[in-house]
């Protein structure tokens, strides 16, 4: 395992080597998950690209830090990590809140970003009352109070029916997220609105969404794609909010095709 201390916290990360002439891909996970969600995509891409993934603060094996957070707390952690590892001009692939981090990163440190893959995300995710309600449930009932609704939004009906062991595993991942990490990041999502920034993105962008995403539905992601000049849009069938889990081969192929199209 790989760890680094920066910005007064310790981050858990994984750096995977690849061809020197290929762009690095940086993966940013969603709320209440850790970087293991990218495992099957990384397996498909191993040997083709250098890759970096990490547990953002308050998640996985990384420190919680001072909660609540602002989106720039997460962005600054990624900036420091990429600078420490001397990674720049990378393809930034962010899922859900990871997409917010990716979009913001492209504005504050454009030298770190060559292109964006925005998975199951939007420049504005949800409403303040929605996030306040979820945060109150978490404060009162812990992560268990949010589990059922989140699993229904995250995964397809087929996954619930035919992948019960995997569903149990991802439920365990969700339940073990530190409460302060969840609350801190939920507050950051609540307070973030990047719609004006999205309309000014001047990079190659691929917007991806699972057909059965119950958190950031396809129409919301398509709206984002239409907002970003020149952005591509990909609907992944047989996937919910986390296509890297349900359709890793499709997402890996989508990433590869998008990156090769930029040469």
Question: For each of these PLM feature ranges, what is it?
Answer:
Residues 203, 217-226:
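Short alpha-helix in the alpha/beta-hydrolase fold that links the catalytic acid
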Residues 126-129, 140-200:
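Conserved alpha/beta-hydrolase catalytic His-Asp/Glu region
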Residues 100-108, 112-147:
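Flexible "cap/lid" loop of the alpha/beta hydrolase fold
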Residues 9-64:
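Conserved HGGG/HGGXW glycine-rich cap/lid loop of the alpha/beta-hydrolase fold
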Residues 201, 207-209:
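Short beta-strand/loop motif that positions the catalytic acidic residue
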Residues 211-216:
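Acidic catalytic loop of the alpha/beta-hydrolase fold
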Residues 231-263:
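Catalytic active-site module of serine/aspartate enzymes centered on a nucleophile-bearing elbow/loop
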Residues 39-46, 52-93, 253:
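Active-site loop/oxyanion-hole signature of alpha/beta-hydrolase fold enzymes
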């Amino acid at each position: 395992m790989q760890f680094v201390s920066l910005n007064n916290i310790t981050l858990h990360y994984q750096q995977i080597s690849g061809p020197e002439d290929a762009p690095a891909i940086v993966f940013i996970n969603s709320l209440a998950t850790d970087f293991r969600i990218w495992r099957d995509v990384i397996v498909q891409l191993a040997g083709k690209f250098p890759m970096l993934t990490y547990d953002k603060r308050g998640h996985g094996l990384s420190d919680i830090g001072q909660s609540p957070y602002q989106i720039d707390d997460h962005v600054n952690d990624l900036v420091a990590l990429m600078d420490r590892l001397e990674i720049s001009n990378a393809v930034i692939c962010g899922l859900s809140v990871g997409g917010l981090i990716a979009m913001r990163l492209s504005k504050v440190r454009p030298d770190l970003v060559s292109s964006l893959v925005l998975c199951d995300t939007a420049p504005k995710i949800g409403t303040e009352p929605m996030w306040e309600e979820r945060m109150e449930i978490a404060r009162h009932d812990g992560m268990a109070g949010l589990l059922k609704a989140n699993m229904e939004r995250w995964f397809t009906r087929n996954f619930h029916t035919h992948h019960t062991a995997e569903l149990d595993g991802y439920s365990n991942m969700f339940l073990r997220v530190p409460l302060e990490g969840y609350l801190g990041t939920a507050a950051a999502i609540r307070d973030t609105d990047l719609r004006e920034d999205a309309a000014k993105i001047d990079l190659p962008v691929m917007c991806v969404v699972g057909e059965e995403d119950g958190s950031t539905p396809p129409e919301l992601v398509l709206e984002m794609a239409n907002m970003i000049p020149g952005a591509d849009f990909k609907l992944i069938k047989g996937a919910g909010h986390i296509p890297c889990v349900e359709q890793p081969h499709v997402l890996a192929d989508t990433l590869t095709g998008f990156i090769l199209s930029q040469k």
